[in-house]
């Protein structure tokens, strides 16, 4: 997924900027998408920062659907934030549209690109530095689910299905394409011995004992923008994995990340 300077310049011509975009270079330490920082010089002399991303099609097989999901979710969030007297420019992601009105641009190589407005005065943290950080993460993701509680989950394709993930795992172990299963036999046995646990939540959902929600599915601290001045969580980011699921999975994932000492 290497990117050339020519490709980047082509991409910049595809978006409706409020000024002249100037590429600043690679940004952040994400491992899935290629991310770049842009400075947009407006006619009044102001400078706005934006985030340019090349979507990884090896991971996201249907980038158009991903962006449609994000637009639907963020539009809903904006409405709810305004109703609550909040700031929709800082409390949810905002997408810059391409010149054709779409929330993405497809370059001549068939690669998909998107641009987000930069959230100023806020930062992401790679690890929990205090109990308050963990609390702010929980508060932010809880608020995220609350704001989306009346969003129709069934309109989003896909589902976070642990039972299906387990079936995929068993097939991968059996195929052992890279010949590495032997080295982790104990770990594999540990997982296989708990196969029945993989279906518990799905069975509760099917029985109507747990509700289907719109879930984030990657509830890590570094997917929260924390205000630099107040040290409070203000915005949930990385919405690529948003899909119908169970809120308890989001809770468990956040505990896994925050409580780990590894």
Model-derived features: positions:
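Juxta-kinase regulatory segment immediately upstream of eukaryotic protein kinase catalytic domains
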Residues: 1-25, 73, 77
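Active-site beta-strand-loop-beta-strand hairpin of nuclease catalytic cores
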Residues: 39-49, 230-232
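Conserved active-site aspartate in kinases
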Residues: 238
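ATP-dependent phospho-/nucleotidyl transfer catalytic cores
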Residues: 25-29, 53-54, 60-65, 119-139, ...
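ATP-binding glycine-rich phosphate-binding loop
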Residues: 17-43
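Active-site activation/catalytic loop segments of kinase-like enzymes and analogous catalytic loops
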Residues: 248-262
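ATP-binding pocket architecture of kinase catalytic cores
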Residues: 45-71, 75-153
């Amino acid at each position: 997924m290497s990117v050339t300077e020519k490709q980047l310049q082509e991409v910049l011509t595809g978006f409706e900027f409020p000024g002249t975009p100037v590429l600043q270079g690679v940004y952040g330490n994400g491992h899935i998408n290629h991310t770049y920082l842009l400075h947009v010089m407006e006619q009044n002399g102001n400078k706005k920062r934006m985030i340019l991303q090349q979507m990884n099609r090896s991971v996201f097989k249907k980038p158009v659907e991903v962006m449609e999901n994000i637009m639907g979710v963020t539009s809903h969030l904006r409405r709810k934030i305004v109703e609550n007297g909040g700031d929709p420019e800082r409390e949810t992601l905002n997408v810059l549209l391409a010149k054709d009105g779409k929330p993405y641009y497809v370059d001549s190589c068939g690669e998909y690109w998107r641009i987000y407005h930069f959230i100023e005065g806020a930062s992401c943290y790679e690890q929990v530095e205090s109990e308050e950080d963990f609390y702010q993460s929980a508060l932010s993701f809880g608020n995220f689910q609350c704001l989306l509680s009346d969003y129709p989950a069934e309109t989003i394709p896909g589902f976070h299905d642990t039972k299906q993930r387990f079936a995929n795992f068993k097939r991968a172990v059996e195929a052992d394409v890279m010949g590495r299963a032997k080295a982790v036999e104990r770990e594999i046995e540990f997982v296989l011995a708990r196969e029945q646990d993989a279906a518990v939540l799905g069975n509760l959902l099917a029985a109507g004992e747990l509700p289907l929600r719109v879930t984030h599915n990657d509830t890590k601290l570094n997917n929260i923008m924390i205000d630099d001045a107040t040290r409070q969580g203000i915005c949930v980011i990385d919405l690529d994995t948003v899909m119908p699921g169970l809120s308890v999975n989001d809770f468990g994932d956040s505990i896994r990340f925050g409580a780990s000492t590894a």
